[in-house]
Amino acid sequence: MSDASSTAPSQAGATSQSTGSRTLLDKIWDQHLVHAPESGPAIIYIDLHLVHEVTSPQAFEGLRINNRPVRRPERTIATPDHNVPTSDRSLPIADPISRKQIETLRENCKEFGVQLFDIDDVRQGIVHVIGPENGYTQPGMTIVCGDSHTATHGAFGSLAFGIGTSEVEHVLATQTLLQFKPKTFELRVDGELARGVTAKDMILYLIGQIGTAGGTGYVLEFTGDAVRNLTMEERMTVCNMSIEAGARAGMIAPDQTTFDYLRGRPECPADFDAAVEAWKKLPSDPGATYDRSNLYKGSDIRPQVTWGTNPGQVCSVDSVVPSPGDSTDVNVQKSTASALQYMDLKAGTPITEIEINRVFIGSCTNARIEDLRAAAAVIKGHHCSDKVNAMIVPGSGKVKLQAEEEGLHKVFTDAGFDWREAGCSMCLAMNPDKLAPGERCASTSNRNFEGRQGKGGRTHLVSPAMAAAAAIKGHFVDIRDWDYR
């Protein structure tokens, strides 16, 4: 893949006909437009298709039934991630459905000539971790996957979004997709984030501000000094959770931080400097108009903790569990009361008095090396509470290897944390890593829906540092006051 153009106007078969100032979305859309009818969806070219074991079996079977090949196998990569066990991989996969899905992915990739990073490959991992770390994800691309959190890749200035199984088949067969062009929504965060406030806190705060439907029909573009100051891994955390605000995708324009991250990665263009010159043209033009814009101050953001059953039910760690009566909206009152009942919380309880018994540090939101370093910095010199079962799951085999080379795994295991193999793990209840009914978990994942981590389990979304501190104390604490050793 290293010689393929990531901006792909020639692959898309169309060039921009637009004039005037354009947004990042406008530029990528125009470059990938194959056909734009006067009414109905457009046909856009897809640069990169990411595949995993859960949403691909029916798609490959559809190709087989209709005697169709994969149109561009070299633009398709696959890995098992959702169902893989994160403990002893020398043993057979116990769950028959999980085992069958992984075996089917192997068979399909072999038959259709698709690159597979299997369980025994160091490049295996969560699909939204391995794409960027290997250089497959590049600015200006259109990227799809049969997974909600494909928006992660928008951190590189790409248009990346999740698709359904029938669309997976369509992309496999044609390397194109029928899409209506979304509207644009700028979320600008100016200033600086305070000490102890992370990218995870930023995106949770923004979702809390606009709500879980605030981005519906839009692609979010994150701008402002506070966003520009984020590392690439932090930007991935922000874009990852765009879907939790109801958005189609999330994007951050590429800059020198992006280029420095990508340089030297195996699947980047052979003429990297030429690619950078093309990528520099992607950011939104001065004066470009968004359909909607909101402005926030980075200094207003504090460490966040979700208290309810969707990511928008969130507050700062130094506040209290809200009451249904805090809102005059009847629907909000009902949803708050329902969430408090499921979460077994009382209104007015300080967030720092909420006790937890499970901790999960991992997922496509927060399982990269910087996330693990942040957790290790908190954990060093401390020990996990006797009341807490804590696990740390790297996002890929490469992340695991690097963490072990840096000695992070020793910090974790010496403190009583469980160190695992790469995979989606406890982000979702599709593998052996699950919450039992009534267990309360501080999790670095992206969804806190009822039963998301296991039937009857209760999930609080936080940053890696906040999760690590909760594991040590047995309850939530304000990481800004932490005793680093």
From Swiss-Prot:
One of its GO terms (biological process) is L-leucine biosynthetic process. [4Fe-4S] cluster binds at residues 364, 424, 427. Keywords: 4Fe-4S, Amino-acid biosynthesis, Branched-chain amino acid biosynthesis, Iron, Iron-sulfur, Leucine biosynthesis, Lyase, Metal-binding. The keyword Amino-acid biosynthesis applies. It catalyses: (2R,3S)-3-isopropylmalate = (2S)-2-isopropylmalate. Its cofactor is [4Fe-4S] cluster. Catalyzes the isomerization between 2-isopropylmalate and 3-isopropylmalate, via the formation of 2-isopropylmaleate. Belongs to the aconitase/IPM isomerase family. LeuC type 1 subfamily. Heterodimer of LeuC and LeuD. This is 3-isopropylmalate dehydratase large subunit. It comes from Rhodopirellula baltica (strain DSM 10527 / NCIMB 13988 / SH1). The gene is leuC.
